[in-house]
């Protein structure tokens, strides 16, 4: 229910932003809302509207992310890959997309740091097969999955196999995946592809680049 004393929506539960109407934040219990999307506490305040771009590349990235939300069609399976060095606000943008999709279109996403996701899956695989299967199925089928810091280190064969299964399923079933990767900007997309393929696999990287628009942030 809306907070009748909310200064943002004035008790209506909705916020008119011109070309879009959002569900007001007061309708969500903030902690439950953030946990539903698995947003880390550090990014609970992150929104597309409070991202502060400095460079032209950051402004372009913000524009693309807002357009992505506005035009989002869950049947298309389109995604975004944000590429660039640390401290550029890539995670902020991805979190902002997840929140906006849920508020504006009631489409649930789920955020995971890639290393943390693989650690949890590996732990369950070795001790609790039922939890492993349930978590993997959930990640395969969630309408929007955000994988933060993908490809930042070399992965084991097991991790590559799990990522390949996850990405291939989402690719084949046209489910949107959002990616951030902390690579320095390469001279060309071919060099970026080669660098990622060293850590992942050509099949995984090929699908990611086919299904996602790649945005360079610097």
Task: Please provide the spans of the model-predicted regions.
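A short, basic N-terminal segment
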Residues: 1-60, 67
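Short glycine-rich substrate-engagement loop in P-loop NTPases that contacts/grips substrate
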Residues: 59-63, 102-141
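Pre-Walker A adenine-sensing motif
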Residues: 63-74
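Walker A/P-loop nucleotide-binding motif
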Residues: 76-94
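P-loop NTPase Walker A phosphate-binding motif
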Residues: 92-105
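Loop/turn-to-beta-strand initiation segments
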Residues: 107-108, 141-144, 173-179
């Amino acid at each position: 229910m809306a907070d009748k004393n909310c200064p943002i929506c004035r008790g209506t539960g909705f916020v008119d932003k011109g070309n879009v109407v959002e569900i007001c934040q007061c309708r969500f219990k903030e902690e439950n809302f953030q946990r539903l999307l698995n947003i880390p506490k550090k990014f609970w305040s992150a929104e597309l509207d409070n991202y502060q771009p400095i460079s032209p590349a950051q402004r372009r990235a913000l524009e693309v992310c807002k357009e992505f939300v506005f035009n989002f069609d869950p049947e298309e399976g389109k995604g975004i890959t944000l590429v660039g060095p640390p401290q550029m606000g890539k995670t902020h943008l991805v979190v902002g997309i997840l929140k906006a999709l849920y508020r504006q279109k009631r489409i649930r996403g789920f955020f995971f740091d890639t290393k943390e996701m693989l650690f949890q899956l590996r732990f369950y695989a070795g001790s609790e097969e039922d939890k492993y299967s349930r978590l993997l199925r959930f990640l395969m089928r969630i309408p929007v999955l955000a994988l933060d810091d993908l490809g930042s280190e070399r992965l084991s064969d097991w991790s590559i196999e799990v990522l390949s299964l996850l990405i291939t399923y989402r690719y084949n079933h046209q489910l949107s995946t959002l990616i951030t990767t902390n690579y320095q900007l390469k001279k060309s997309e071919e060099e970026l592809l080669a660098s990622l393929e060293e850590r992942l696999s050509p099949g995984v990287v090929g699908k990611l680049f086919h299904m996602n628009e790649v945005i360079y942030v610097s």
